[in-house]
Amino acid sequence: MVQFNEIYTEYENTKDVCKFCEIYKENSTATRFLLIRSLDKPSLTEIVEQYSAEDTSGNMKILTEKAFHSSVTIQQLVEYIEKKRTELIAQREEELNGLQNILNDFPIVNCGVRNDKVDDIIKPFVRNKSLKSFDTLIDELDNSVLPRIRQYCLWSYYNQTSNDIIELFFLKHPTVLPTLRKIHDIDFFIKVDEQILPFDLKFTHISDSYFDLASQGIIRNMDISHHDDFYIENDNNENEMQKIKSFYKNFKKKNRNLNLPNLKGLKKNDLCDLLASSGDPEAIAFINKMKDNHSSYVPSTSEELHSLEWWNYKYQGERLFCNNNRLFIFLAFKHKFVDGRELKGKTFEIGNKIKDMLGNITNNGMHTVKYFYDKEASLEGNYTALSLSAIYAE
């Protein structure tokens, strides 16, 4: 019999939820534990009252242990959580009432802060020894620091509110079993083919880095000696960014009279806008060709989505690394060289994509993603996870 402290400690410390589920798969122990771990305190109290001879005293960990040692079954846990669904939906709908109207009125905003570190804006300001008068200090604060913090606050609101509205589509779907409290690296469970599988929800735009690799060719790996599902066809070829830079550099040299700025600090969209503003037929033809190519890199088939899912696992940052089952919602512009984060406010359209995906879900429809991770020595190794995704692109 699995000891509670063993399984509890293993889960709290793991960066590989899939491995955890594999270790404790016998008698569906992992599933039962995770369902119990996902209950809030009032729910744990009710479970202990109904299915255990123990009293209901103690903190969250003690109540979780008492519920774990009770007679409650997976089916009874599922039925209990299902009874809470209507209450949760009503609560979320009341909280979110009218907020879509605010999103509709939002200006286009960028985050403006890397890794949510607002202090990175404030530190240079407070350490700036060139501000020699109070007036110049206030001018720097009002015109440089505060606009960036305001932008970050607006983006954070837009991002969080969009998340909350879109998550309601999952809460309402009968295939999805919600968690009743936060549980690390699991947002909900999916019921499929008599299984209950934990999933983490990932909203993300398709990264520039993915488009660069896709432009070099992402190919299915048929060599079973390598764990990665895909590989890059030719990483010596110029990628999307390099092609745009090369054309811009040559165009700038041939058209010195235009006084085009140097490459440093310019992004794909900046370079294309500068080329387009020249009105040169060759430059415009090049941009149109690059946009057509860019559109072809936006996944439209299950196989293409599989490669995008693989990329997001393989190249995830080491700071927040986790190997867990994931349900991705990807956002992208087909003919613009900007990320698709502003599309997140299109909650109705994204909701329809979610309904279509969940309405046709089967075990066979999920992707088994295999990847080798080597961005951090302590995490290096072969990993396997289940993945699902939907994409909204314009």
Locations of regions flagged by a protein language model:
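Nucleic-acid endonuclease domains
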Residues: 1-184, 203-394
